[in-house]
Design a protein with these regions (language model features):
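Beta-rich catalytic cores
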Residues: 2, 96, 129
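Core segments of cupin and vicinal oxygen chelate
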Residues: 2-45, 90-91, 135-163
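Eukaryotic phosphotyrosine signaling hubs
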Residues: 3, 57-61
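Vicinal oxygen chelate
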Residues: 10-14, 33, 62-106, 137-148
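Residue-level detector of conserved, well-ordered beta-strand and adjacent loop positions
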Residues: 39, 51, 101
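Intrinsic, low-complexity N-terminal interaction/targeting segments
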Residues: 46-48, 84, 89, 106-112, ...
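Conserved functional hotspot residues or short segments at active or partner-binding sites
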Residues: 54
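Surface-exposed beta-loop interaction hotspot
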Residues: 102, 108, 113-145, 149
Length: 163
């Protein structure tokens, strides 16, 4: 299972996308409707998306996995009783899978069958992929247990990093 992307909603999505291209070196991966996709030099179709919204929020954080990994995850989530629902991704790369809601409302999307793209010959400082995400939670212990016990990721105790 690999961390692929984070999907954000915010006002002035075009301006945010422009900033990420000019300042952080991400590449424009395209626009669908009011969603701007930005990619790195690796094989993921995008790393960050910005969707126009009047409010700021994280739409989801997405992971890609095999069908077997998705089946095992689906079984663990069902046994845990945590809110989850099936999803078919309409974002770049597609895929199908499961959205799991963590205790503080964070949405994690797990996709099988998502398509990769050709890597870009990037600049030396162009991002390749996301390496981590940080969640702020009112109950970090509860969120950490779900991430470890149900989702099968490692949470580092010193900074609570998901691996």
């Amino acid at each position: 299972m690999k961390l692929r992307s984070i999907e954000l909603a915010l006002p002035d999505a075009a301006k945010a996308a422009h900033f990420m291209v000019k300042t952080w070196g991400l590449a424009d991966a395209g626009v669908q409707g009011d969603t701007y996709y930005l990619r790195g030099s690796g094989t993921f179709p995008y790393l960050v998306s910005f969707t126009e919204s009047t409010d700021d929020f994280v739409r989801s954080t997405s992971f890609v996995c095999s069908d077997d990994e998705l089946a095992a995850l689906t079984t663990r989530v069902a046994a845990s009783g945590f809110p989850a629902r099936p999803v078919v991704s309409e974002d770049l790369g597609g895929g199908h899978g499961l959205i799991v809601e963590l205790p503080d409302g964070e949405l994690l999307r797990f996709l099988a069958g998502a398509q990769d793209v050709a890597s870009l010959p990037g600049k030396p400082d162009m991002p390749v992929k996301l390496t981590h995400v940080v969640f702020n939670a009112t109950d970090a212990e509860a969120s950490g247990h779900v991430v470890e016990d149900v989702l099968g990721h490692e949470v580092r105790a010193d900074r609570r990093d998901v691996r």
